Amino acid sequence: MKKIGMKILSIILVMSLLIGGSSATTTASAADLGKTLENTGLGIVALIFSTLVGGLNFIVPDSKDFIKVEDRVVENFYEGTETWNDEAKADAKWSLGHAKASLVPSDWETKDYYLGGFIDPNNGMVNKVEEIIDDMQIRVIALSDGSDRGVALFANIDCIGFSNGDIKEIRKRVEAMDLGVEFNSINVSSTHTHSCIDTQGLWTNLFPKLFTNLLKSYIPFLEKERGADAEYMEFVYETAAETMKKAVEDMRSGTLTYAVKEVNDEYFNNKNRSQSTSIIDELARFVFTPDDTNYKPTMIVNIAAHPDVAGLPVDEIDNGRDLTGDYIYYLGEKIEEKGFNFMFFNGAIAGIYEGRGPAGDGVPTERRYEETLRYGYEIANMALNLTNTVEQIEANMTDAEKAKIAEEKEIGGENYTLWYEGWEPVTEKVLEPNLNILIKEVKIKVTNPLIKLVGKLNLVNYTVCKEGLDYYIFAEIGYMEIGGVKVAFMPGEIVQDLICGGGSLTADGSYSGKAFECKTIYELFGEDAICFGLMNDALGYVVPDNDYTMALLGDHYQEMISLGRYAGSTIMNGFAEIAEEIK
């Protein structure tokens, strides 16, 4: 497929050379000419794709569930804390509760379930669950600063993505429980694991459902099937709400600390968007320690890396039909082994994948999930030891851990890399009990014809709104300061340049040859801000407007799974408004 795509691109580039050759100047450098030809070719591909899919859109009627923008009613939405406190109250105290549950259905061996992440020729275009390797989990924390401004709930689900419509279903069930506390926010994020049961709908019996819903589009009285399995989603809603209830009931007072460290950037692989030049190689952790020592502390980990290794179909054994939580499961397993509860938030992960080289160590593995185990364990060891010296790290090791290192050094030889070699500890700071959250909606214009078609065919649980001939989706963005630590809530897979700046925001580095005009998260809130990605929605990829093209080839495949060319600026302008509000 890739070879065919490259041949097509080559033909298009030759055509664009013939068409545009007369406009080239003799003074243009070879690099400039190459860039011009490449962009011209990409533009032609984008035009062809948009025209073909746009034509299909034209003949497929809108879903009867689409509504006018002015008729939209906002429900099950939380704006955050009522006030923005600059400092902690005199008598304030952190309280945190934790709970987790499995989302593996009991009937998985007798009913067809589909993994969200890959439908690929290498798995025969079949992604039904055949084996459970470890687990698919939901993890929840309930957090309060004791200021009577409500409790914040955070859930993290092992899945490819969780749409805002489904998140509101969870909120509705939590609200119905009447747990005796006020919530300032109920937040749900996805790990973006590519080897757990599909919760979005794009991977569940896709092709039969696609054609069935296409036919039903022309018969008004027939209901389209939803993308994700309806019974399974009901199970997820109920399990999520019940787990949130348990987290609230588990709340107890304690202290909260924070540490962050830049780790080797080889642990993070920018695989398919080379013009986005930033790599966020920070590992951040929060640790909640209860006052009552009879209860476990809770560790919250934040890094930015796609969990897509275990689910990629490559052969008959690793065939993309095995359920696993990828590296995040093993990250949690190791941290729990050391006596902590575990919570996770992924970061800005567009184009950023697990860099398995340093964790691989030249040690042979038989299955791809074993590679994620090694990666997860290594990240966990770093998280557990951010504030420890090399001497402390070695003193805290068990005999079994020391023996394992010695054994693997022998196997890996010169390819073995000790994760803590040259390790420098960082300082952990105690966080004042002051929690501020501000969440707002942004109205994103949908320009991607493929996403319009997905909406018309009812495959994903979005509320699509119309204004004239244009389509819109409302998404949630948010900003939190937790004891002074700044956190941006991003509703999808965000290009890291939008967080900290980078090549794709510049005129020279972008497809359009123009600079991105909005400020980055670092510019708005400071370079110490971190990102919780896929939070309160899963909008697909969010790329800078100036580097957006529907060419699908090369470094622009992310645009195929994005709302459109204005998602980046709409979201960043929303954050600019938040920055103004909290001044």
Where are these regions (language model features)?
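Bacterial N-terminal signal peptides that target proteins for export
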Residues: 1-12
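Hydrophobic core
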Residues: 13, 17-18
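Sec-dependent signal peptide cleavage junction
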Residues: 19-32
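Conserved beta-alpha junction segments in alpha/beta enzyme cores
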Residues: 31-189, 193-374, 387, 394-583
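Glycan-recognition surfaces in beta-rich domains, encompassing non-catalytic CBMs
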Residues: 383
